[in-house]
Amino acid sequence: MTASTSVAVGCAVGIPVGVGIIIAVCFWFNLQKRYKREEQDDRELERAIYDESGFVSFDNFGPLRDSKDEAALASSELKNPDHTSGSSEGSAHPEEKDGKSRDQEKPLGKKNSKYYVPAYRRKINLLQVRNNNYGNNARQKSVVDLPSINNSSNVSLSSSQRHITKRQISVYDQMVPVISDEGPKFFADPSSDTNTSNDQNKASMIELKHNTRQSINENLIRKLQNQDFGSYYPRRASSSFLNGNISNASFHTRNSSITSVNKRDALEDVFATPKSAAQSQLPNTFDKDNEGIDADHSVKDSRSAITDKDKDIYKLQNNYDVGNIGEIAEEDQYENEFTNYSQSKREFIESLRPK
């Protein structure tokens, strides 16, 4: 009972496992054959791609041909009775030659049915057969009186073997594109008249480019000269001048903060104690300065003069006045026509008062 049980269990387990292993081995062999076939097809495709003669000239289809197709073509040429003698071929009718060439094309297309041949390879082989037949017919018609050695199969075999050259460098790797600078003149017909006209046009184009570049540079220089890179605010033209007793080391304020309020007749020290007499003469000096503005900034200065007359006039002064002790001057030493925050402070205080 134990022996029969072990045999039954072994058969029940071993037979399915063995059958599965056999089936897996069969599938593996089929897969390996398929891989080999695909590798061979890839090699043929690479040979067709990296073949220079197949892309440059369409008359040389030798490198694109398979070795088995070459053997079939050689055997057909050996068995072909058309190559036996040139005189019989010359006397034959052209319609009979066309019929023979068609008969040769049909078996070549149906040969090697055991192996897979791509459609493009079949077309190439048929074209090669036609080209060979046309070349042989033309050669036999032109050379009729020569001996039959010229039309033998040895010549065709040597010529076909001469064309079978394996090249691993593609045409696209050797091409260097050349593009003309003139554009539409690249496809123009070269001639003596057009060459002279092209030279003249080229010279005129170079001169035009030079002139446009020069005009662009001049415009850029003019714009840069008109720009004001020295101050954040736009400058105002003024005819007043600085005081001579101010040293360059201690004078750090802007020119526009002093020159707009200085007098021409009697210049005073801006760092000295201000006086009431000097302050009373400020409107007259301010009017004189407004009259000396240049013609280029007349519109801007007229607007600024109207606004400046309405505003309070500020002068660089200290925070005390001997003549007017009861009034405290809260003006800053570095205040100018752009940083008039004391006026803003007064306006703010006035706005806080009840109306």
Curated annotation (Swiss-Prot):
Q: What's one GO BP annotation on this UniProt entry? A: cell wall organization
Disordered: annotated span: 70-114, 276-298
**Phosphoserine: residues carrying this PTM:** S142
Q: What spans are recorded as compositionally biased (Basic and acidic residues)?
A: 92-108, 286-298
So which stretches are on the Extracellular side? 1-8
Where can this protein be found?
Cell membrane; Bud membrane
Determine if Transmembrane is one of this entry's keywords: yes
The entry's cellular-component GO terms read: cellular bud membrane
Residues annotated as carrying Phosphothreonine in the record are: T273
Tell me the keywords, alphabetical order.
Cell membrane, Cell wall biogenesis/degradation, Membrane, Phosphoprotein, Signal-anchor, Transmembrane, Transmembrane helix
Indicate how the chain sits in the lipid bilayer: Single-pass type III membrane protein
Cytoplasmic topological domain residue ranges = 30-355
* Membrane-spanning parts: 9-29
Role: Plays a role in cell wall integrity. Affects the cell wall polymer composition in the growing region of the cell.
- Protein family: Belongs to the SKG1 family.
Q: What is this protein called?
A: Suppressor of lethality of KEX2 GAS1 double null mutant protein 1
The encoding gene is SKG1
